[in-house]
C-alpha cells in the first residue's frame, strides 16, 4: 500500500497500491464502515496524494498520460492535477490544473477547510523547493503567492483551527 486519505466525513478512504514496487500508483476507494471496495479506480497516478474536496464529492490527484510499454521507465512529464468524482469512471475526471509549458513541474493541492480556497504547491522534478499559488473561489484562476523556487513552503497552518 502506498498513500491513504480519509474524507472529511470519515466514511471513505482513498488508498493507493503499486505493482511490483513501481512509482506508478492505482487509487481505490473503500467504504470504511462496510469494508466495501467501491468501483472507483484511478490509474497512472505518480508522486501524488489524494486530497478530498470539502463536500466529499471526490478528490484531487496528480496523473500522467498512460505511457506505452517502451516508455514505461522514462522520465514522466506534463502531469495533470485531476479531480475524480466518487462513483464515476476515471475517463470522466476533470483536469483541474496543468501547465504544458512547464513539463517538469508537478502539483499538489490543499483544500482549506470550510472554504472554497485552494492552495496549489508546485515543484520541479525531485527538488523540494516549491511555489505556492492560491485560488480564492471556485472557477477562478490561481494567483501566485510565492512565484519562485527558493524554499520549501507548506500550507499546514492554513488548516490549524488555532489560527
Predicted regions and their residues:
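Beta-propeller folds
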Residues: 1-155
Amino acid at each position: 500500500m502506498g498513500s491513504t486519505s480519509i474524507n472529511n466525513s470519515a466514511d471513505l478512504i482513498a488508498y493507493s497500491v503499486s505493482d511490483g514496487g513501481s512509482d506508478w500508483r492505482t487509487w481505490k476507494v473503500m467504504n470504511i464502515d462496510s469494508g466495501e471496495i467501491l468501483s472507483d479506480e484511478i490509474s497512472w497516478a505518480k508522486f501524488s496524494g489524494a486530497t478530498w474536496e470539502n463536500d466529499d464529492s471526490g478528490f484531487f490527484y496528480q496523473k500522467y498520460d498512460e505511457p506505452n510499454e517502451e516508455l514505461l521507465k522514462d522520465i514522466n512529464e506534463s502531469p495533470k492535477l485531476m479531480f475524480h468524482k466518487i462513483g464515476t469512471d476515471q475517463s470522466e475526471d476533470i483536469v483541474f490544473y496543468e501547465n504544458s509549458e512547464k513539463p517538469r513541474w508537478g502539483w499538489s493541492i490543499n483544500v482549506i477547510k470550510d472554504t472554497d480556497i485552494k492552495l496549489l504547491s508546485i515543484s520541479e522534478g525531485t527538488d523540494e523547493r516549491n511555489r505556492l499559488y492560491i485560488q480564492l473561489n471556485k472557477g477562478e484562476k490561481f494567483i501566485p503567492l510565492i512565484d519562485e523556487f527558493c524554499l520549501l513552503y507548506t500550507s499546514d497552518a492554513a488548516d490549524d483551527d488555532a489560527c
